Amino acid sequence: MRLGIVCGSFHRDEVERMLEYARDEAASKNWEVADVAWVPGSMEAPLALDRMLHRDEIDGAVVLGIIERGETDHGLVMGQSVTKAVIELQITHNKPIGLGIIGPGAEPEHIEPRLEPHARAAVGA
């Protein structure tokens, strides 16, 4: 299995750690991380995923990111939009995509303990 991983860079330090957990999980399954793409945030992930999944050498993908709770419903709307787009991309390309986005609505104190389990679960999906 050759994976592509799309990472949202809005919380870059935390997402870099998620990427390392995802790489480790892929290696434990003898899977190859064939490509990593960084995008500004979770909202830009679907386009990067679409481009990645068009490539024959990519068998599946993972998206990693964090959507914190804000003062408005923007994060919730963004999370729903990204999730819907990811599901549509899986169907369109007939390739699995593991969703490793923490949130929407994550409080700062909830982010740290979720980094590893979300990243590893996304690879396993």
Give the location of each predicted region.
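Short, ordered loop/turn segments at secondary-structure junctions
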Residues: 9-10, 66-67, 101-105
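C-terminal binding/interaction regions
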Residues: 75, 80-125
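Glycine-rich phosphate-binding loop
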Residues: 47-86
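Short beta-strand segments at enzyme active-site cores
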Residues: 36, 60-64, 96-102
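N-terminal beta-loop-helix "entrance" segment that forms/cooperates
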Residues: 35-51
